[in-house]
Amino acid sequence: MLEISDRVNITAPSAQGLFYGMVTVVQSYYADGAVPCGKARDYAYYPIRSGMIDVARAYIPLEYVEEITKYFAYFKLNEIHLHINDIGQNGYNIFRLESDVEGLTATDGYYTKDEYRTYQKRMLDYGVTVITEIDTPAHSACFASVVPELMLDANHLDISKPETVEFVKSLFDEYITGDDPVFVSRKVHIGTDEYSNAKKEVVEKFRAFTDHYIRLVEGFGKQAVIWGALTHAKGDTPVKSENIIMNAWYNGYADPATMIC
């Protein structure tokens, strides 16, 4: 509740609500040069208000990412999703975080673990949760230079190999385990978009792969976020759906109408 007379009074059930009330006052003054008297009750219609930035294909210094994140807070968005690995122009392979895997980290710009951890914690003070995505088993060209034997082709991991499953697990272990994990948020994006559905055998392996990593991150107390892909990869292998967040970006990959029970 925002009440303005000869003084500004903001009441809210949480610190986040108080922060948004303050933002409303600042927005009003910035727009009109004054703050009108009266009462206003405001609340978020959607619990998740998010946007994604692809920092893989185009390196953005962390200082600027932080500035953008503060703008998210100003417009009352409460999550920012960072896509950190992909394939760049001219075959340049990109992984934007410092990694224990030798040769994996991008050479044209990356974020150290310490500075990335600090950035995420600082943004929580602005009410914005940073969700980091490691995209596998497609969009995986960045791994070709370090584990070429695990690649199906230039951009896809070979998920038929047990060694691939162990390699991807080691990546998540590196970033979500420990007393002070690199990924601060309880939510972890595991990717899973745009893999082949040309053969039923591949589809079933992809579904098993997706289910495996959902359960893996949950085992560390995290909530899995995935790209919608299971309409594209329709099959028999069950994939856990309870308490999962799905980013449905294209109906050809995940059609909401066919997924409603």
Predicted regions, residues:
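Active-site neighborhood of glycoside hydrolase catalytic domains
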Residues: P148-I245, W249-I260
